């Protein structure tokens, strides 16, 4: 209800203040009553002895001060010499005159206060017999105990009879006795009714009577506050009774009464704060309406420059009023949720204390209420924190606008630093509130999950009983096509809801981590800003600090460049010592090449026998008859491999076009390694072999082969495929062990140089190709993978680009400092609420 409607409904009613006649301090009053012969009336005089006593003390103090001033003036006149006065004494005399004038002004003010106090300390008036009776009737209306206390007054003639007979004559003795009785009566009336009422009856003044009345809006607010206090006292009484309850039945009944009392508390609080919010809501609506009218006038009407300027000033004024109303609404909202959240927390804590007094079976009857109360506590606290968050956001917005509106001046930079530090403090408070919000959201989810799990356990433990049937036909006849859902369907729905809540809790955890990182950035910026302010307070300029940072950066860059040059020199010396084409491949490329090479070797094994590699093979010393060449497949090998000497008389029978040789005797067998072949002595010159097969083109060519003698095909009995595979596995294990030892013992660059020196690496020229994305790499570092997953890219606004351009082109140091401060506070602040995936307030209603 608006205030205009209240005025229309409540017109004609007045509200008197309840304690308007209470006296804050008791004073001593004295009444003097005398008979005035000329007027024929009683002269009543009242003196406030308390005020008169204070005035007398004040007079004595003032007289003492005047005496000291007079003595000081006499001393100055005696010590002064008019004929020979020095300039210093002239200056001292000129300086003493203002102090004397000030003291005189104080004396005048004290005299005025004394005069007003004396006027308020004494009252006088003339009262006839009829006037005294009328005053007595008014005092009896206040307190009926005064009715028999008025002394007997003679009857006074009225009208024509007063002209004919005049005033009744009384003797002096009767008059004095009646005056004494009236003095006693007035003293008793003072004690019974109080000075405020008696003074207004006997000595009425012409002051405004508004002090005795109060506005109806204040009366209504007082009524709402009284209702709220009654609801609080009722709930507090029930909470006190809860401690003494020992039976579960009584406790459940008390819980229902507490719920009713809390409902009354919420209702009273809502009515009170709705009434308090109403004027601010009206002001906000009025301000928005007036601003809209001003906007329409500026857009549609043809106005002069003065009128346009006045409308703009009026618009700014209404905007300030609307902003003030919004801040007041937010503050009242915070107070409302503080009241409700505090009451629910007390109820929940008392219920947890009751849970420890009862067993699990007995407490099962109150589990639902406890879950409901826990959910309500988290929800109210969440709304309270969101209201506080809105208030802090408004303050941050005001600070940001003030920073943007700073003008050039002497204290502009200092004010900018102060505003930025204040912004960081508000942001840290906001982070604490946001952490509390996430905590309460997680508590809400936990309460819902506990309730769902309890419902699922109840569904699983539920026993369903069916009626018995005499025959299957009777069972089919009673089948209902529209059967209710089975417990399994209910459990599936509850499980689905549980998964949704678990996913939402995961998002809350991610938001916590994000806010934690932002808070660390804010703390770092705030610490730096405080250090800069302290350095500025001690007179330390920022220029040496910047110079030190630049020098440190230059030293770091020079150190990196020197290290790079040293590495290049080492590689150059290595190339000079070991000439040849060397290409260093990264670990990632080496792994890819090794996988590709292993795949090619497996493909070759499916087509032919395994290739001969450098290995130590142990064979039998006794010769064996060789199988025909068609029965044993020939082994293909690179040209760089050493040929094996023949055995016995099998050499004469070998065809001249044989590509491979047989194995030598065991006593002549040596370790053959293709990597160490340049260092070993060359074999005897064999005849030139035929051209290599096409499948061996991938192997790098080595030194041209020497002519060898034709040999027959070797027997599988001496060098079969299983022995070759075992030898290959041993070589791989040895190479991996050796490489791991070298990796642990030295740095990566030393490992590469040493391996190249001993010839264990066969390097080839790397091909330039686009590599596929690494499966082990995190998708968060790959923007293309993020785009494929559907991550939305935030569009850079044109205003931001223009602002950056302005900041880059601006030569004003204040403008650059403002932009830098805004950039820092933007880094320390979280992203907008529209970009995160936090659940809205409506999600918690389910």
Curated annotation (Swiss-Prot):
Residue numbers spanned by region Disordered: 68-100, 472-494, 533-572, 598-717, 822-846
Chief localization: nucleus
Domain WH2: 779-796
Topological category with respect to the lipid bilayer: Lipid-anchor
Localization of this protein: Nucleus; Cytoplasmic vesicle; Cytoplasm, Cytoskeleton; Endomembrane system
Bias type Basic and acidic residues, positions: 555-572
Source taxon at top rank: Eukaryota
Keywords, in A-Z order: Actin-binding, Coiled coil, Cytoplasm, Cytoplasmic vesicle, Cytoskeleton, DNA damage, DNA repair, Lipoprotein, Membrane, Nucleus
A GO CC annotation given for this chain: endomembrane system
Biased composition (Polar residues): 533-544
Annotated Pro residues bias: 679-710
GO MF, one annotated term: actin binding
Coiled coil segments of this chain: 216-254, 410-513, 545-574
Name of this protein: Junction-mediating and -regulatory protein
Lineage: Eukaryota, Metazoa, Chordata, Craniata, Vertebrata
Gene name of this polypeptide: jmy
């Amino acid at each position: 209800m608006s205030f205009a409607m209240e005025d229309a409904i409540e017109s004609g009613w007045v509200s008197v203040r309840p304690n308007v006649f209470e006296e804050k301090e008791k004073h001593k009053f004295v009444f003097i009553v005398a008979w005035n012969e000329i007027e024929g009336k009683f002269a009543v005089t009242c003196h406030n002895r308390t005020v008169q006593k204070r005035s007398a003390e004040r007079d004595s103090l003032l007289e003492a001060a005047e005496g000291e001033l007079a003595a000081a003036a006499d001393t100055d006149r005696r010590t002064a010499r008019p004929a020979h006065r020095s300039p210093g004494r002239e200056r001292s005399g000129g300086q003493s005159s203002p102090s004397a004038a000030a003291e005189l002004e104080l004396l005048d003010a004290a005299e005025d206060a004394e005069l007003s106090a004396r006027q308020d300390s004494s009252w006088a008036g003339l009262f006839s017999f009829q006037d005294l009776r009328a005053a007595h009737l008014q005092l009896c209306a206040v307190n009926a105990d005064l009715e028999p206390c008025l002394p007997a007054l003679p009857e006074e003639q009225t009208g024509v009879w007063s002209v004919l007979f005049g005033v009744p004559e009384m003797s002096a003795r009767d008059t004095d006795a009646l005056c004494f009785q009236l003095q006693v009566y007035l003293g008793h009336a003072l004690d019974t009714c109080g000075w405020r009422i008696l003074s207004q009856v006997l000595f009425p003044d012409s002051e405004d009577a508004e002090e005795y009345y109060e506005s109806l809006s204040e009366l209504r607010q007082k009524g709402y506050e009284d209702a709220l206090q009654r609801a609080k006292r009722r709930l507090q009484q029930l909470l006190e009774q809860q401690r003494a309850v020992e039976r579960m039945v009584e406790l459940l009944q008390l819980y229902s009464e507490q719920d009713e009392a809390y409902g009354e508390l919420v209702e009273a609080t809502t009515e009170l704060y709705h009434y308090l919010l109403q004027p601010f809501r009206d002001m906000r609506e009025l301000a928005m309406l007036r601003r809209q009218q001003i906007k329409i006038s500026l857009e549609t009407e043809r106005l002069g420059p003065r009128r346009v300027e006045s409308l703009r000033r009026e618009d700014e004024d209404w905007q300030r009023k609307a902003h003030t109303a919004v801040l007041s609404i937010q503050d009242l909202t915070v107070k409302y949720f503080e009241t409700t959240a505090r009451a629910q927390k007390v109820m929940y804590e008392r219920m947890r204390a009751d849970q420890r007094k009862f067993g699990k079976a007995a407490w099962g009857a109150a589990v639902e209420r406890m879950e409901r109360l826990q959910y309500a506590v988290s929800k109210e606290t969440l709304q309270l924190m969101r209201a506080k968050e809105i208030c802090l956001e408004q303050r941050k917005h005001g600070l940001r606008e003030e920073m943007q509106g700073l003008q050039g001046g002497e204290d502009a930079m200092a004010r900018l630093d102060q505003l930025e530090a204040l912004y960081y403090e508000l942001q840290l408070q906001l982070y604490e509130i946001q952490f509390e919000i996430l905590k309460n959201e997680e508590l809400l989810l936990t309460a819902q999950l506990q309730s769902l799990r309890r419902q699922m356990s109840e569904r699983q433990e539920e026993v369903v009983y069916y009626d018995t049937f005499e025959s299957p036909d009777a069972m089919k006849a009673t089948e209902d096509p529209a059967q209710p859902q089975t417990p399994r369907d209910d459990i599936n729905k509850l499980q689905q809801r549980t998964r949704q809540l678990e996913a939402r809790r995961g998002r809350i955890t991610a938001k916590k981590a994000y806010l934690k990182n932002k808070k660390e950035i804010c703390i770092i910026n705030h610490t730096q800003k405080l250090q800069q302010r302290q350095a500025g307070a001690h007179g330390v300029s920022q220029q040496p600090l910047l110079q030190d940072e630049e020098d440190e950066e230059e030293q770091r860059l020079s150190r990196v460049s020197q290290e790079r040059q040293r590495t290049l020199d080492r590689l150059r010396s290595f190339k000079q010592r070991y000439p040849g084409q060397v290409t260093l491949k990264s670990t990632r490329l080496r792994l890819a090449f090794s996988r590709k090479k292993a795949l090619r070797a497996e493909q070759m094994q499916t087509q032919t026998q395994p290739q001969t590699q450098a290995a130590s093979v142990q064979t039998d010393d006794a010769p064996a008859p060789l199988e025909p060449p068609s029965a044993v497949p020939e082994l293909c090998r690179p040209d760089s491999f050493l040929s094996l000497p023949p055995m016995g008389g099998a050499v004469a029978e070998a065809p001249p076009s044989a590509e491979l040789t047989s194995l030598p005797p065991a006593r002549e067998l040596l370790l053959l390694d293709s990597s160490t072949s340049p260092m070993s002595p060359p074999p005897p010159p064999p005849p030139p072999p035929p051209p290599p097969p096409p499948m061996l083109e991938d192997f790098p060519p080595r030194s041209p082969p020497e002519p060898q003698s034709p040999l027959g095909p070797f027997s599988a009995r001496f060098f079969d495929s299983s022995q070759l595979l075992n030898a290959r596995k041993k070589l791989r294990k040895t190479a991996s062990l050796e490489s791991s030892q070298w990796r642990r013992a030295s740095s990566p660059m030393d490992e590469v140089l040493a391996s190249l020196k001993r010839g264990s690496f066969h390097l080839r020229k790397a091909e330039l190709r686009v590599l596929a994305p690494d499966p082990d790499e995190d998708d968060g570092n790959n923007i293309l993978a993020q785009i494929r997953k559907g991550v939305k890219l935030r569009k850079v606004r044109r205003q931001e680009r223009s602002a950056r351009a302005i900041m880059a082109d601006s030569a004003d140091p204040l403008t650059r400092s403002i932009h830098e401060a805004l950039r820092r506070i933007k880094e320390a602040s979280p992203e907008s609420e529209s970009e995160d995936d936090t659940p809205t307030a409506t999600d918690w209603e389910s």
